Amino acid sequence: MKKGESPEKVLFIAGHEFLYNPQNGGQQCSLRNYNLLKSIFGDNNVYLCMFSNYRYEHLNSNEKIFPTHKNFLELLIDTISGRNVCGRKSRKKAIEFINSLNVDIIFCDSSIIGKILRDIKISGVRIVFFHNIEKNYAKNKVLHDNFGYLIPYFSYSCNERQAVASADYCVFLNDRDRKEAEELYGTQKSYILPITFEDAYVEKTKDFSDRIRPVLLFVGSMFAPNISGIKWFVEEVMPELDDFVLYIVGKNMENRKKELERDNVKVIGTVEDLSVYYNLADAVIMPIFFGNGMKVKTAEAMMYGKTTFATQEALEGYDIESVRDRGIYECNTKEEFVEKIRKNVSVHSTINQQVRQIFLEKYETGVQEKKFQSFLMRCIKEHGRDAETME
């Protein structure tokens, strides 16, 4: 089957904005999923239903955007009512649009809109993608960030359970999430689609030869696990690495400059081009101690072939055994970070080809596309047989 010639039709339901300037890991993963489906089935055969308040000047005829909450009060009322991404009117219009379609696959790119999936009347194999186990995500927010997340905790849990009940297949980023979903909701048919990137590595020619100290890099947005982890690293590890310099890059991290910056810690924050900093860095650090799903920045660092020092949580879902302690180093304590960084990082460290090769073999999007296509075709075939049996 050639790309663009597929007769199958697909509906992609997104619970959040991801087309306009995707920056966080969830948005990047949603865009990856959407582009994968368009690559497999053809642009004209994939319908989009997305909840967003961004005003697009142009949309294709098969792309529909429905408004989400306008303010915090609407968000609170709707979440209490179990409507996590939109109000009653927007939900009704979205379901009307969905029910007007004739598709072979309903791909729900969020497990927190299970009630919408439940109320869809059209046929087609139903696949739910789990960015993480949202119930556990909300639990972590309650424990580490804000008690106000108790309301989403119950709403997410209810919708997630309904999503599993309404799905024919569930897709997870890693085996940990699959096992947790099975324990919580009794999921049966599943597939693992890990975080991937299209290979965008281009070595920059800028000369950094005047550097004296080795450069460490942390990339992450102003998100609770990132803040907690990098704050710990700056306070506990960097005083022991006074002959190193750490750059902190990521959306809105400049807001934490006063709190985090030291003589050997430079807070850059939001940047247009991350590749400049990846090419500058001798190594990447990922001190993430709690979270869910897979960490997108781990795959990104691998794409750039960076020697990486990361916690078990930051490496969750990644097969790194062939480069363990030969390019990717697991560190879970202050002592492990200090010892392994000192032993394995120097000024002007070159690209680690072994780390980059693992990315190209396992986490480059094209490598996973053929496997994912086979899974989707199998889903359609099995769903068709089930429908014939019911008749």
Protein language model features and the residues they cover:
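N-terminal subdomain of nucleotide-sugar transferases
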Residues: 1-57, 101
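Conserved catalytic-core segment of nucleotide-activated headgroup transferases in glycan assembly
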Residues: 29-30, 194-261, 267, 271-272
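Membrane-proximal helix-turn-helix segments that form the acceptor-binding/catalytic region
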Residues: 35, 92-96, 134, 149-170
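Acceptor-binding helix/loop patch of EC 2.4 sugar-transfer enzymes
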Residues: 70-83, 127-158
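Donor nucleotide-sugar binding/catalytic pocket of nucleotide-sugar-dependent glycosyltransferases
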Residues: 161, 165-203
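Acidic donor-binding loop of glycosyltransferase active sites
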Residues: 168, 279-293, 304-306
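Short hydrophobic beta-strand element within catalytic cores of glycosyltransferases
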Residues: 297-303, 307-312
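A charged, aromatic-enriched C-terminal amphipathic alpha-helix characteristic of glycosyltransferases
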Residues: 346-381
